[in-house]
From Swiss-Prot:
Source species taxonomy: Eukaryota, Viridiplantae, Streptophyta, Embryophyta, Tracheophyta
Pfam families for the chain: EF-hand_5, EF-hand_7, Pkinase
Catalytic site: D167 (proton acceptor)
Full protein name: Calcium and calcium/calmodulin-dependent serine/threonine-protein kinase
Keyword Ribonucleoprotein: no
Organism of provenance: Lilium longiflorum
Domain EF-hand: 361-395, 396-431, 432-467, 474-509
Length: 520
């Protein structure tokens, strides 16, 4: 990875539309200036907040391998920097030992600048695994077996190089292109680990639906943990729903730890015993009893000898569509929460602003000035933010404006979200009861529609100070619980009545939300 200022990402690529955003990254489509439009790439920008990568040499395009990086330990950096460090280390190993492989994303190049580290990756334009599946009216066991075969092939190559993915799920499996016979690629190695090489990031953000029993109980995680995740994916492909149903996250964890799933639902009657036997072996609580990726590549069901050609029940496809839609909604909301440096930002804000106590009328005036001054709706540039502070006669805060602005410029695009900064500033005042709830709600009801989206609700939690964050907030699935409790009718938006009812039902939930309005 190069630190030569003479070579910049913009020298080699035209960066165009945004393809997706994650908790600590953004992916954009790039066009090679030397090779033209037929060589589009995906440029994943990993934002960093705490440190600058030490001087390291970037491999030139086409070279195998990235030079060693002298990294600090993960405990010395923030979560976002840990993810950045981890993904670079794992991608380096993939380039050295795995690439090129038809079922593993390929890294073309790496750049670094003040905005972060840019990974230039193979562009996968064929869509996510489940999106592609549910676009069909029906599919067969044989087609599901082809999916498993491709994922197993990628895992076999990764595991041979002692790389554990640790976060295998449908959204991390993308088709290379729109062709019917497109290859499927495993991607997103931010939570991966290289055995005896990197410090794994344990149990932070993985969806609990795919997490193995040993990962939940914080025992040794191995390549067998990836095989468990593949077993869950296969179960969902053949039934349309995850194997471990439970009314609460805690009960779901207990079922996973016990390996408590079944094939009793009526659509399983049409599925071959070979497929069910394979799922049972992959979902064995004992990791040593699970087949390896290489074992799967020789399994009669996976290679097509025993997988049925007949189409699966339409009910399965319908359930999978519903599951997939809800999964995507949650993923967007959770990414919104994670993108805000949940454990760091509010304390930094308080340190900057000291004892400046924002009153309710000041917050409302601030909103009005944002609306009047900002050319781009709810987003403000630094000069616009400084103009807002001047209009509010907050002269003492103007010298701090660049530092406050930087705290809220999540994707380093030179703008901040007015709603985020209002919620952040509201941490410095006291409030309680319905007024506090209404204030929270109105902060993010930007269009005064009377309801807020899941993404907006997630954003509301961004400003939580570390002291007020529940101890188990980073446990897999905990954020899912919060969203489920809010959205009573599962329609993707939350009315004030739903919001208030959720607070009244669960005092611990009220503590979480109202923490954003209390003095820290």
């Amino acid at each position: 990875m190069s630190r030569h200022e003479s070579r910049k990402l913009s020298d080699d690529y035209e960066v165009v539309d945004v393809l997706g955003k994650g908790g600590f990254s953004v992916v954009r489509r790039g066009i090679s200036k030397s090779r033209g439009k037929n060589n589009d790439v995906a440029i994943k920008t990993l934002r960093r907040y705490g440190y600058t990568l030490p001087g390291a040499q970037r491999s030139q395009p086409g070279q195998r391998g990235l030079s060693p990086l002298g990294m600090p330990t993960l405990k010395q950096v923030s979560v976002s920097d840990a993810l950045l460090t981890n993904e670079i280390l794992v991608m380096r190993r993939i380039v050295e030992d795995v690439s090129p492989h038809p079922n593993v994303i390929h890294l073309h190049d790496v750049y670094e600048d003040a905005n972060g580290v840019h990974l230039v990756l193979e562009l996968c334009s064929g869509g996510e695994l489940f999106d592609r599946i549910v676009a069909q009216d029906r599919y067969s066991e044989s087609e599901a077996a082809e999916v498993v075969q491709q994922i197993a092939s990628g895992l076999a190559a990764l595991h041979k190089s002692t790389i554990i993915h640790r976060d295998l799920k449908p959204e991390n499996c993308l088709f290379l292109n729109q062709e019917k016979r497109s290859t499927l690629k495993i991607m997103d190695f931010g939570l991966s680990s290289v055995e005896d090489f990197t410090d794994p990031i344990v149990a932070l953000f993985g969806s609990i639906d795919y997490v193995s029993p040993e990962a939940l109980s914080q025992r040794q995680v191995s390549s067998a943990s990836d095989m468990w995740s593949l077993g869950v994916i296969l179960y969902i492909l053949l039934s349309g729903c995850p194997p471990f149903h439970a009314p609460s996250n805690r009960e779901k964890q207990q079922r996973i730890l016990a390996g408590d799933f079944s094939f009793e639902e009526h659509t399983w009657k049409t599925i071959t015993s070979s497929a069910k036997d394979l799922i049972s072996s992959l979902l064995s609580v004992d990791p040593y009893k699970r087949p390896t990726a290489n074992d799967l590549l020789k399994h009669p069901w996976v290679i097509g000898d025993s997988a049925k050609q007949e189409l699966i029940e339409p009910e399965v496809v319908s359930r999978l569509r519903s599951f997939n839609a809800r999964r995507k909604l949650r993923a967007a909301a959770i990414a919104s929460v994670l993108s805000s440096k949940v454990l760091l930002r509010t304390k930094k804000l308080k340190n900057l602003l000291g004892s400046h106590d924002m009153k309710s009328e000041e917050l409302e005036n601030l909103r009005a000035h944002f609306k009047r001054i900002c050319a781009n709706g709810d987003n403000a540039t630094l000069p616009e933010f400084e103009e807002v502070l001047k209009a509010m006669k907050m002269n003492s805060l103007i010298p701090l404006a660049p530092r406050v602005f930087d705290l809220f410029d999540n994707n380093r695009d030179g703008t901040i979200d007015m709603r985020e900064i209002l919620c952040g500033l509201s941490n410095l005042r006291n409030s309680q009861g319905d007024d506090a709830l209404q204030l929270c709600f109105q902060m993010y009801d930007a269009d005064r529609s009377g309801c807020i989206s899941k993404e907006e609700l997630a954003s509301m939690l961004r400003a939580l100070p570390e002291d007020c964050v529940p101890a188990d907030i980073t446990e897999p699935g905990k954020l899912d619980e919060i969203f489920d409790q809010m959205d009573a009718n599962s329609d993707g938006v939350v009315t004030f009545d739903e919001f208030k009812a959720a607070m009244q039902r669960d005092s611990s939930l009220q503590d979480v939300v109202l923490s954003s309005l209390r003095t820290i």
